């Protein structure tokens, strides 16, 4: 987008970095190392022609400065993700029985494997608890295989719902939303679940940690820590009143911090529009 604006002669150019993706997660070896080097060069070139760059979390902003992907002379701002329409994603009542949900592309760095492994552990103690997965298999090098997905379904660990054009019914049918991602910009699905009044379990990782105040509207767990993830799930199964209280705080945070109209207004102000 920045390159197109420059080639088109646009004078006031702005960029929004929404997340860093496959090339910036995991160890930089093989294809990932090559992609990372290429993408970094593209960022250096394209962002050098912007008036202002927006980031969705402070970790990404710091990384771009550290790697010199963004010249010191170019200002940057951190915004609260892309926001969520709190009217469209309205508060909904909790289901009567505990259930968990993950919505994601079926990639390793989204924490899909950890979610399935934690589900299997929890179901040993609580066999009636439901773990649903919404998403699709991607052609990304980090993609979950069809065989893995089939094994989780056959074992009864996961209920797979496929790709949904509207996720609101799926969120309404869960009591807790889970995203064990390795890195995000600001995860939109978490914001949607928060707006609908759901407690959240996510990772203490860039982009994810900003959405949860640990112990207030959910829990933060270390990246790739299946044990901590399953323990947090069990805490919420055993304390339904906490699920309701955390969900109410999530809704409050969505209204106060992540309302799309507030986010857009803040960005337009920074852009001088």
Could you describe each region identified by the protein language model?
Residues 163, 182:
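Aromatic "clamp/platform" in nucleotide-sugar-dependent glycosyltransferases that forms part
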Residues 199-202, 212:
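Short hydrophobic beta-strand element within catalytic cores of glycosyltransferases
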Residues 228, 235, 242-257, 263-266:
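A short, well-ordered alpha-helix in the C-terminal region of glycosyltransferases
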């Amino acid at each position: 987008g920045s390159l197109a604006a420059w080639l088109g002669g646009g004078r006031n150019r702005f960029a929004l970095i929404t997340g860093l993706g496959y090339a910036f997660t995991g160890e930089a070896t093989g294809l990932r190392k090559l992609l990372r080097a290429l993408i970094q060069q593209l960022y250096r070139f394209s962002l050098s022609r912007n008036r202002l760059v927006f980031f969705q979390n402070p970790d990404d902003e710091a990384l771009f400065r550290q790697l010199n992907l963004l010249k010191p002379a170019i200002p940057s701002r951190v915004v609260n993700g892309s926001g969520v329409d709190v009217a469209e994603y309205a508060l909904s009542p909790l289901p009567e029985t505990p259930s968990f949900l993950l919505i994601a592309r079926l990639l390793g760095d989204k924490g899909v494997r950890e979610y399935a492994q934690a589900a299997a552990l929890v179901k040993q103690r609580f066999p009636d608890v439901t773990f649903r997965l919404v998403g699709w298999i991607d052609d990304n090098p980090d993609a979950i295989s069809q065989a893995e997905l089939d094994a989780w379904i056959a074992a009864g660990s996961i209920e797979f719902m496929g790709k949904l054009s509207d996720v609101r019914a799926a969120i309404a049918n869960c009591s807790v939303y889970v995203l064990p991602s390795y890195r995000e910009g600001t995860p939109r699905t978490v914001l949607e679940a928060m707006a609908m009044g759901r407690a959240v379990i996510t990772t203490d990782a860039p982009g994810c940690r900003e959405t949860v105040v640990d112990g207030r509207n959910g829990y933060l767990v270390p990246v790739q820590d299946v044990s901590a993830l399953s323990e947090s799930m069990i805490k919420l199964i055993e304390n339904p009143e906490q699920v309701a209280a955390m969900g109410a705080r999530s809704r409050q945070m969505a209204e106060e911090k992540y309302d799309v109209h507030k986010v857009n207004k803040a960005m337009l102000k920074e852009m001088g529009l």
